[in-house]
Amino acid sequence: MADLDEQLSDEEKVRIAAKFIIHAPPGEFNEVFNDVRLLLNNDNLLREGAAHAFAQYNLDQFTPVKIEGYEDQVLITEHGDLGNGKFLDPKNRICFKFDHLRKEATDPRPYEAENAVESWRTSVETALRAYVKEHYPNGVCTVYGKKIDGQQTIIACIESHQFQAKNFWNGRWRSEWKFTITPSTTQVVGILKIQVHYYEDGNVQLVSHKDIQDSLTVSNEVQTAKEFIKIVEAAENEYQTAISENYQTMSDTTFKALRRQLPVTRTKIDWNKILSYKIGKEMQNA
């Protein structure tokens, strides 16, 4: 280990540490951070050199955060990043500071939204919240309305997780949907992501994503929001069903092929009658 320390520069150590942190499984950021901290053995170097990794992890994972004084959680995403550690809560029209290491929101202040697209954003958010409440018991969603390349754009983000450390597994669902508000029809683009980590007597990760494209009829705000939710629901249901079916197929075929069905003797042991076996008698006489 001493030779390795001599070979690696501080910059290289931080680069490796940052990679570990960015790729931490959902719900296991603190565990990975603490392990990396012990390995690096230099808190100042870790905090200063890997700060970007803390931020990138939260942005990638759509980390939900509760703001004191407000009922609903908001997601930390690149779409709400205002710079200098500040983020947007479009529903409550506030901005706030976010500590990427502690995952805490502070200093909420009023923030003026894009008025030209706000009515569309609100309609989509209302419909999406109802959808998320029905399909994701622990789900959180945030909807942004902004101008991108001069076009009014709606961006909808969904996050839902189950952290079961006592049962040795953690998992997170993320989806992101975008469409521009254009007359008659527009293109909806989405990406769905699933990440699950199971680590009891082993270490298995499921990391999957799917890109979606569909056309959306644009009319008034409320009707367009309803049609948008139909697209989201159909795509996410289809993806989740496909994942479940593939997982069952793997369980029935691939995983079974990895283990021996019977001992080398091709005979199952009846443990209730172990004393009747020769080995049992030998153990009894020993």
UniProtKB/Swiss-Prot annotation:
It comes from the Eukaryota. The gene is CAPZA2. PANTHER family: F-ACTIN-CAPPING PROTEIN SUBUNIT ALPHA, F-ACTIN-CAPPING PROTEIN SUBUNIT ALPHA-2. Component of the F-actin capping complex, composed of a heterodimer of an alpha and a beta subunit. Component of the WASH complex, composed of F-actin-capping protein subunit alpha (CAPZA1, CAPZA2 or CAPZA3), F-actin-capping protein subunit beta (CAPZB), WASHC1, WASHC2, WASHC3, WASHC4 and WASHC5. Interacts with RCSD1/CAPZIP. Directly interacts with CRACD; this interaction decreases binding to actin. The modification Phosphoserine is found at S9. InterPro entries: CapZ_alpha, CapZ_alpha/beta, CapZ_alpha/beta_2, CapZ_alpha_1, F-actin_cap_asu_CS. GO terms for biological process: actin cytoskeleton organization; barbed-end actin filament capping. Belongs to the F-actin-capping protein alpha subunit family. This is F-actin-capping protein subunit alpha-2. Keywords: Acetylation, Actin capping, Actin-binding, Phosphoprotein. It comes from Mustela putorius furo (European domestic ferret).
